[in-house]
Amino acid sequence: MTLVDKFVTHVISESSFEEMDRIYLTNRVLSRVGEGVLEVETNLDKLIDLKDQLVEETVRLETIEDSQTAREILGTELMDLVTPCPSQVNRDFWEAYAYSPEQAIEDFYQLSQKNDYIKLKAIAKNIAYRVPSDYGELEITINLSKPEKDPKEIAVAKLVQASNYPQCQLCLENEGYHGRVNHPARSNHRIIRFEMVGQEWGFQYSPYAYFNEHCIFLDGQHRPMAISRQSFERLLAIVEQFPGYFAGSNADLPIVGGSILTHDHYQGGRHVFPMELAPLQKTFRFAGFEQVKAGIIKWPMSVLRLTSDSKEDLINLADKIFQEWRQYSDSSVQILAETDGTPHHTITPIARKRDGQFELDLVLRDNQTSAEHPDGIYHPHKDVQHIKKENIGLIEVMGLAILPPRLKEEVEQVASYLVGEAVTVADYHQEWADQLKSQHPDLTDKEKALAIVKDSVGAIFVRVLEDAGVYKQTEQGQTAFMRFVEQVGILLD
């Protein structure tokens, strides 16, 4: 069967189109790929594989330019053919939700995979493994899924006239957007609309997911990230409205925040992160909130866990802790609320439902810098930046490392170095490589060397999280943590 015929056959079977639509669909495909592909045969059988072959044939025939951007634009246009229009997607979602919220979520997740909005083939390239630590097993990923622009495209992007449409990659205006060299193609993108605390919000999946059912909840308006009482209200509303999902927010200050601070949004999904499994190492009750179980968890960052049947109690207590933290200083452990009116303190909050109760984890953050630590006092320090130098955002806070693509090759180089092969190790890894070699001087097995290097990456990630923790895992640090807790107001035994 020809490539076009087979693709159209799959579109009909995977959508609301019918056999009568075959000629129409063929012409819609040809308008995008050109008639030169009509004679191309294929032995592929999966919709996304057929789409990929159509894109490559179109490049080969020079109907589109040979660039990542052109490929993405064409690919999303082709997959838009199997994607219902936004109003239909929303209608289907809410009709299913009335009977089963879980089924509505599952159906939307399946659609987002089927139409290649979630890039399963790319995500499969990621390297993922677990490492034991004093805080339980941590998750390490080397992110290889996002395609990198070639230098020509980067140069072109610099010359493109600035556009304010869509304002950012999280705006509702991305739904169906054609794409350009400096903004991703979103023809096959769909967003579920829902009301939250009196405002319109959107629910979508992340195209390059870092974990199972990684999704984004985004403000219907382009408003900056802001942690407030409303954040706690919304996060708890999400975990109630989207059963089985956690929801968390990046912090709203530079250094300790995420990569997008210009558009308010939360992340969620169906994944148990290492932090969720962390036990309470100290418990107490806050005065006036006797029904809320509270404590400090055993975790490299500074986390208060609150659990209750009552959303209202959790919201009120979380807001009280947040307001106290924003103005709290303790010079004995280098904690400072502000400098000349510039705030340093915020929170990374995470919500979930567990055993029928609502749970909030509040991670205390401080974005001070110093002469010794110009990138951030509570940020990965210089000696671990060869592994991770980017901000420690929500996902890393919860114990999942997202490491840059360069590490795939660099980890292998260090492993080769350990077994005595003549390889060049990156300058910034040399000290680390020498340290590992001195610890394992007689290594000859490459596989064993690779395992040692990967475990060491995990140990360094623990250090990264400890650097980001405002109260250190020392007697002095934990005593200071309790001083803050007492400042909020706890019941004394």
UniProtKB/Swiss-Prot annotation:
The record's subcellular location field reads: Cytoplasm
Look up the record and name the pathway of this protein: Carbohydrate metabolism; galactose metabolism
A cellular component annotation (GO) from this entry: cytoplasm
| Alphabetical list of Pfam families matching this protein | GalP_UDP_tr_C, GalP_UDP_transf
The UniProt GO MF terms for this protein read:
UDP-glucose:hexose-1-phosphate uridylyltransferase activity
State the top-level EC class. Answer: transferase
Which residues pair up as cystines?
Answer: none
Principal place of residence = cytoplasm
Q: Name the catalysed reactions.
A: alpha-D-galactose 1-phosphate + UDP-alpha-D-glucose = alpha-D-glucose 1-phosphate + UDP-alpha-D-galactose
UniProt entry keywords in alphabetical sequence:
Carbohydrate metabolism, Cytoplasm, Galactose metabolism, Nucleotidyltransferase, Transferase
Please cite one Gene Ontology biological process associated with this protein.
galactose metabolic process
Q: What Enzyme Commission number(s) does the record list for this chain?
A: 2.7.7.12
**HAMAP family found in the cross-reference section:** GalP_UDP_trans
Q: Which family does it belong to?
A: Belongs to the galactose-1-phosphate uridylyltransferase type 2 family.
Q: What is this protein called?
A: Galactose-1-phosphate uridylyltransferase 2
Instruction: Look up and give the organism this protein is from.
Output: Streptococcus pneumoniae (strain ATCC BAA-255 / R6)
What taxonomic ancestry is recorded? Bacteria, Bacillati, Bacillota, Bacilli, Lactobacillales
